[in-house]
């Protein structure tokens, strides 16, 4: 990959809408994907954390890959969340995503079995080699996986041709700086947290894998473009305006708040599959107040 921003600047980690019966609402998936790429998103991650991948079957995921790819219709990149703590399972899902014509795969650090750093390296290397034509975005999120993938491991993996990016959700600016300084120029770092996008971009990140872009994608895009064109004051202004929303969308475990927010604005994305549960009335009231202040509802 020769282009640092191959996946774009603002990538939405898309929710998976459900019907009242708890089935995937494929018709609404199509409409939401279309909306996102016309309202600030350069790409979509489908079946990531925000998409409730742990409670989706692989068959549901493959159907979602296909529908989102068709809905986006070349107007942005579609990245499949095919990560697993089983290397063979991740390979099978990634190969299926490649067959369906997706633009990349998101590979999360294996959770629960807690491999050492060498195991992480071998895991991601094996997946990348099994699907050499599909770009890979690594996903480091210690708060969910139980361990941090070190900069040294990420730097080593960045030498693999089709490992082109990392979603950094460690919240560690020093780690981001180290990755940026020791990876190839065309290796892209994305913030995994909306509220850290601006700080991480000053450390070399190119954009964000966003949750808030469901609601304010154009504003986030505007913030990034302001920074890129040298208007730091404007970028800071936008960031501070959106900051309460960025934090409000993490008042409970993601994607509980963003689903509540989307329901508030009329998207009717439904509830969540257990063990996730609905946002409490008190937290929903607080989130609604933030959204009202931004004229979102």
Swiss-Prot record:
Function: Catalyzes the condensation of (S)-aspartate-beta-semialdehyde [(S)-ASA] and pyruvate to 4-hydroxy-tetrahydrodipicolinate (HTPA).
Subunit structure: Homotetramer; dimer of dimers.
Keywords in alphabetical order: Amino-acid biosynthesis, Cytoplasm, Diaminopimelate biosynthesis, Lyase, Lysine biosynthesis, Schiff base
One GO term describing the cellular component: cytosol
SMART domains attached to this UniProt entry: DHDPS
Gene that this sequence comes from: dapA
Domain of life: Bacteria
NCBIfam families, per the entry: dapA
A family per Pfam: DHDPS
Catalysed reaction, written as an equation: L-aspartate 4-semialdehyde + pyruvate = (2S,4S)-4-hydroxy-2,3,4,5-tetrahydrodipicolinate + H2O + H(+)
Annotated site location: Part of a proton relay during catalysis: 49, 112
EC number of the protein: 4.3.3.7
Entry's Gene Ontology molecular function annotations: 4-hydroxy-tetrahydrodipicolinate synthase activity
Residues given in the record as pyruvate binding sites: 50, 209
Protein name: 4-hydroxy-tetrahydrodipicolinate synthase
Lineage summary: Bacteria, Bacillati, Cyanobacteriota, Cyanophyceae, Oscillatoriophycideae
List of catalytic residues: 139, 167
Intracellular or extracellular location(s): Cytoplasm
Pathway field: Amino-acid biosynthesis; L-lysine biosynthesis via DAP pathway; (S)-tetrahydrodipicolinate from L-aspartate: step 3/4
Main location: cytoplasm
GO biological process entries: diaminopimelate biosynthetic process; lysine biosynthetic process via diaminopimelate
Family: Belongs to the DapA family.
